[in-house]
Amino acid sequence: NTVSSFQVDCFLWHVRKRFADQELGDAPFLDRLRRDQKSLRGRGSTLGLDIETATRAGKQIVERILVEESDEALKMTIVSMPASRYLTDMTLEEMSRDWFMLMPKQKVAGSLCIRMDQAIMDKNIILKANFSVISDRLETLILLRAFTEEGAIVGEISPLPSLPGHTDEDVKNAIGDLIGGLEWNDNTVRVSETLQRFAWRSSNEDGRPLLPPKQKRKMARTIESEV
């Protein structure tokens, strides 16, 4: 159920944190660790549960499972699970950099938050993202950001810590909303090759998204009206 799932997630995060404290984690591992911490705090607040207490309970659940699990069953489980890959357009610095908006606009779409600076006009913009892929489909979006040619961040799509879980279609719709909002101000938006392949296939050869004018106007109005 929801509580036991949260307890197990807390304990597994604790194990991963101990691993990271020994300087054994790579950049994607550390990135997920930091973002999962925010997610757990949000879930704990929503459920009204203390994270330390939940971690202890999660440890007991995991220990009970390990006692009952045979080595052979564990091997079969691992083999049968499809492998996920972590893909990165952005460096750790690009992901963790703070940014500010002169004319902030924000929309919540399901478990995703879309933010953009409406003051940005007549710029060439590229969308970059870090996310995991499983069976050639986007599994989990970690973070998507919109960059100008000068490297300034002007937009972002991020999962809400208190509402975990989204589909590749949710991400694609959010990308469409962000593109529509940026193009409303006569910006030229391109999508990274990685995003084109796994999350946004409606692009021409140079990576520019193909959005009808009516759809662009609708998306821009949607972002503006929901702030």
Curated annotation (Swiss-Prot):
Gene3D superfamilies: Influenza virus non-structural protein, effector domain, S15/NS1, RNA-binding. It is found in: Host nucleus; Host cytoplasm. InterPro entries: NS1, NS1A, NS1A_effect_dom-like_sf, uS15_NS1_RNA-bd_sf. Residues 177-212 are annotated as: CPSF4-binding. One of its GO terms (biological process) is symbiont-mediated suppression of host mRNA processing. Upon interferon induction, ISGylated via host HERC5; this results in the impairment of NS1 interaction with RNA targets due to its inability to form homodimers and to interact with host EIF2AK2/PKR. A motif (Nuclear localization signal) lies at residues 31-35. The keyword RNA-binding applies. Residues 220-227 are annotated as: PABPN1-binding. SUPFAM superfamilies: Ns1 effector domain-like (SSF143021), S15/NS1 RNA-binding domain (SSF47060). Residues 206-227 are annotated as: Disordered. HAMAP family: INFV_NS1. This is Non-structural protein 1. It comes from Influenza A virus (strain A/Tern/South Africa/1961 H5N3).
